């Protein structure tokens, strides 16, 4: 039986570091919001069977997304943190029967709207049948410094360091189990939750273009990348 690939986009955050008057996933770049650009990537990819967006219960922008993408499921059951939002989304996918425990969930940051299609394909091909799952990531290229106040305390050896990206792909049952803990403090991505179970996900080569819109100046680079598509 074919294993489904389901994209899950947690979009309940407020994007405080971005400094806009609305959550950063709803900031417009060109004629579309960041979230609409992101959803388009998954809706155009033939390897993705279903896309779900999980937003805050108080979200007032999601109706536009639903209008633009009527086939996308938009659920207003987001939590206070990313981990809670993903947990709620996975639980509902399983409860509604839209996902079986053996189906793949690809969790992707709403603010990574420049994900190249070939990177998504690579993740599905290399991690889609791996029981331990896998994530897109790129080797750390810059020299890293450990800080002590405002001074350098040490240079960090970067040989084995990778920078995590998204999507992060895991079986629905595994992800549900990994996020079942009552206290999700310190869980900054899905891989870190899975690692706490003693499982070591695959590292799949990501792409430098798959950057996350975090600071206001990132919008300039994102705009250039989107214009180049």
Curated annotation (Swiss-Prot):
Per the record, the pathway is: Isoprenoid biosynthesis; isopentenyl diphosphate biosynthesis via DXP pathway; isopentenyl diphosphate from 1-deoxy-D-xylulose 5-phosphate: step 2/6
Keywords, A to Z, come to: Isoprene biosynthesis, Nucleotidyltransferase, Transferase
Per its UniProt record, what InterPro entries does this chain match?
IspD, IspD/TarI, IspD/TarI_cytidylyltransf_bact, ISPD_synthase_CS, Nucleotide-diphossugar_trans
Molecular function GO labels: 2-C-methyl-D-erythritol 4-phosphate cytidylyltransferase activity
Its EC number is 2.7.7.60
User: Known CDD domains for this protein?
Assistant: CDP-ME_synthetase (cd02516)
**Keyword match Nucleotidyltransferase:** yes
Mind telling me which residues the site (Positions MEP for the nucleophilic attack) is annotated on? 158, 212
- GO terms of biological process kind: isopentenyl diphosphate biosynthetic process, methylerythritol 4-phosphate pathway
Marked site (Transition state stabilizer) residue numbers: 17, 24
What function does this protein fulfil?
Catalyzes the formation of 4-diphosphocytidyl-2-C-methyl-D-erythritol from CTP and 2-C-methyl-D-erythritol 4-phosphate (MEP).
The cross-references to NCBIfam families, in alphabetical order and at most eight, read: ispD
The record's HAMAP family line, in alphabetical order, gives:
IspD
- What family name appears in the similarity comment? Belongs to the IspD/TarI cytidylyltransferase family. IspD subfamily.
Name the record gives this protein: 2-C-methyl-D-erythritol 4-phosphate cytidylyltransferase
What is the organism of origin for this protein?
Neisseria meningitidis serogroup C / serotype 2a (strain ATCC 700532 / DSM 15464 / FAM18)
């Amino acid at each position: 039986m074919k294993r489904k690939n389901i994209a899950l986009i947690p979009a309940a955050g407020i994007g405080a570091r971005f400094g806009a008057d609305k959550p950063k996933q709803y900031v417009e770049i060109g004629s579309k919001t960041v979230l609409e650009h992101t959803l388009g990537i998954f809706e155009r990819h033939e390897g993705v069977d279903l896309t779900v967006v999980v937003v805050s219960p108080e979200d007032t922008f999601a109706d536009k997304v639903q209008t633009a993408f009527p086939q996308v499921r938009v659920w207003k059951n987001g939590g206070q943190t990313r981990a809670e939002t993903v947990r709620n989304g996975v639980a509902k996918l399983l409860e509604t029967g839209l996902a079986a425990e053996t189906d793949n969930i690809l969790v992707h940051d709403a603010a990574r709207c420049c994900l190249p299609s070939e990177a998504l394909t690579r993740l599905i091909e290399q991690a889609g049948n791996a029981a331990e799952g896998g994530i897109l990531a790129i080797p750390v290229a810059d020299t890293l410094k450990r800080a002590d106040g405002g001074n350098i305390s040490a240079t960090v050896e970067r040989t084995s360091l990778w920078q995590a990206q998204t999507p992060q792909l895991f079986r629905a049952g595994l992800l549900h189990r990994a996020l079942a803990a009552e206290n999700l403090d310190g869980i900054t991505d899905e891989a870190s939750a899975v690692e706490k179970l003693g499982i070591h996900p695959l590292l799949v080569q990501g792409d430098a273009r798959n950057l996350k819109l975090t600071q206001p100046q990132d919008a300039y680079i994102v705009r250039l990348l989107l214009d180049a598509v």
